[in-house]
């Protein structure tokens, strides 16, 4: 009986780890606003975002609402150019 219980606990733990590993990038990645520096020209002036910018946006996608609420970054993240940049990169504009 104890052996069966141990197997169930191990199975549940493994399942939890698989779910965490499969979670969207924002759930795993640390929020690092500095990763968005490559998007500055797109966010500030509406320039076409680079592939690197789009990749970094994808990696930081789970952090957008946190950035939008931050007094340092919020005005940029909520700007029309930022929304256009997200759309150009094929990302949904978050509703925070």
From Swiss-Prot:
<dbReference type="InterPro" id="IPR016140">
    <property type="entry name" value="Bifunc_inhib/LTP/seed_store"/>
</dbReference>
<feature type="disulfide bond">
    <location>
        <begin position="31"/>
        <end position="63"/>
    </location>
</feature>
<comment type="function">
    <text>Transfer lipids across membranes. May play a role in plant defense or in the biosynthesis of cuticle layers.</text>
</comment>
<protein>
    <recommendedName>
        <fullName>Non-specific lipid-transfer protein 2G</fullName>
    </recommendedName>
</protein>
<dbReference type="GO" id="GO:0005576">
    <property type="term" value="C:extracellular region"/>
</dbReference>
<dbReference type="GO" id="GO:0006869">
    <property type="term" value="P:lipid transport"/>
</dbReference>
<dbReference type="GO" id="GO:0071555">
    <property type="term" value="P:cell wall organization"/>
</dbReference>
<dbReference type="Pfam" id="PF00234">
    <property type="entry name" value="Tryp_alpha_amyl"/>
</dbReference>
<keyword id="KW-1015">Disulfide bond</keyword>
<feature type="disulfide bond">
    <location>
        <begin position="54"/>
        <end position="89"/>
    </location>
</feature>
<keyword id="KW-0134">Cell wall</keyword>
<feature type="signal peptide">
    <location>
        <begin position="1"/>
        <end position="29"/>
    </location>
</feature>
<keyword id="KW-0446">Lipid-binding</keyword>
<dbReference type="InterPro" id="IPR036312">
    <property type="entry name" value="Bifun_inhib/LTP/seed_sf"/>
</dbReference>
<keyword id="KW-0732">Signal</keyword>
<feature type="disulfide bond">
    <location>
        <begin position="65"/>
        <end position="96"/>
    </location>
</feature>
<dbReference type="GO" id="GO:0008289">
    <property type="term" value="F:lipid binding"/>
</dbReference>
<dbReference type="InterPro" id="IPR033872">
    <property type="entry name" value="nsLTP2"/>
</dbReference>
<keyword id="KW-0445">Lipid transport</keyword>
<keyword id="KW-0964">Secreted</keyword>
<comment type="similarity">
    <text>Belongs to the plant LTP family. B11E subfamily.</text>
</comment>
<feature type="disulfide bond">
    <location>
        <begin position="39"/>
        <end position="53"/>
    </location>
</feature>
<keyword id="KW-0961">Cell wall biogenesis/degradation</keyword>
<keyword id="KW-0813">Transport</keyword>
